[in-house]
Amino acid sequence: MEHFISIRDIGKKEILNILEEAEKMEELLNSEKHSNIMNGKILATLFYEPSTRTRLSFETAMKRLGGTVVGFTDIANTSVMKGETLPDTIKVINGYADLIVMRHPSDGAPRLACEYSNIPIINAGDGSNQHPSQTMLDLYTIKREIGHIDNIKIAFIGDLKYGRTVHSLCHALSFFENIEIVFIAPKELKIPKEITDDLDNKNKLYNNNIKYSETGDIDLTGMDVVYMTRIQKERFPDLSEYQKVKGTYKLTREHVEDKDLIIMHPLPRVDEIDISVDELPQAKYFKQSFYGVPVRMAILKILNEKNKNKKSEI
């Protein structure tokens, strides 16, 4: 794994390796021992779009491993505003850092960046396309809170059209056995056909008994996992279309308090989960956010080890 751009670039072996390494990183965090795994290394965080959890958890992960962080969170203060191209920015950063984490509004921008980089690049989200480190912490949450990833029934609710976390997680789940998925969304935000086609293809390839269905109604009977998403206002080309679907779904105590399941959400939350749900034992979205640190520690460690002998050609 030279870069980490899409969950589609890795297989089940690599996924399990990251999960195993994340367990070790969580143990390290709980032990409060100091790590120097990334001592002397610099992580550059290039965030062309806003971020709270992803950026801060990557920065925390790097510092917990003994490394340091440089970067930007607002392109208004960078040479991008002067017309600097992405390839030029990447070439420059290659001379400053050992790894790059980047978020960009354009689908495919991190993959383009890889063509101009001699150091590992991690995709922290590109448009409505991919968010692979979020996928890994989602899988890690399921494994830690349920005990296994195989043999689960999961409901995805909300913005399934623009929700890159949903797209990535569906692909990752396709490597596991006996997964049943229920897509719950308004017709305007239904899961893209390319995602369901991918599930069909994986089912034929691995014969791992993946099932899925689509509906507009919330019925959580028999679910192991509920994965809520916000309606992503910033992705709508027409604001009037957003107004039609905003507030379509709101998860309440009545939906879940008598059910044996876990509730996940990639955050930020707007109004799709009532705050009264927060105190229920089923609510795991803040724990899910915490798991981002050991998972991203694992990703940084693996990429650093894989690329430690690769020297910059600049």
From Swiss-Prot:
Carbamoyl phosphate binds at residues 53-54, 103, 131, 134, 267-268. It catalyses: carbamoyl phosphate + L-aspartate = N-carbamoyl-L-aspartate + phosphate + H(+). It is an enzyme of class 2 (transferase). GO terms for molecular function: amino acid binding; aspartate carbamoyltransferase activity. L-aspartate binds at residues 82, 164, 230. GO terms for biological process: 'de novo' pyrimidine nucleobase biosynthetic process; 'de novo' UMP biosynthetic process; amino acid metabolic process. The keyword Transmembrane helix does not apply. InterPro entries: Asp/Orn_carbamoyltranf_P-bd (IPR006132), Asp/Orn_carbamoylTrfase (IPR006130), Asp/Orn_carbamoylTrfase_sf (IPR036901), Asp_carbamoyltransf (IPR002082), Asp_carbamoyltransf_Asp/Orn-bd (IPR006131). Its EC number is 2.1.3.2. Pfam families: OTCace, OTCace_N. PROSITE patterns: CARBAMOYLTRANSFERASE. Keywords: Pyrimidine biosynthesis, Transferase. Pathway: Pyrimidine metabolism; UMP biosynthesis via de novo pathway; (S)-dihydroorotate from bicarbonate: step 2/3. The keyword ATP-binding does not apply. HAMAP family: Asp_carb_tr (MF_00001). Catalyzes the condensation of carbamoyl phosphate and aspartate to form carbamoyl aspartate and inorganic phosphate, the committed step in the de novo pyrimidine nucleotide biosynthesis pathway. Heterooligomer of catalytic and regulatory chains. Belongs to the aspartate/ornithine carbamoyltransferase superfamily. ATCase family. This is Aspartate carbamoyltransferase catalytic subunit. It comes from Methanococcus aeolicus (strain ATCC BAA-1280 / DSM 17508 / OCM 812 / Nankai-3). The lineage of its organism: Archaea, Methanobacteriati, Methanobacteriota, Methanomada group, Methanococci.
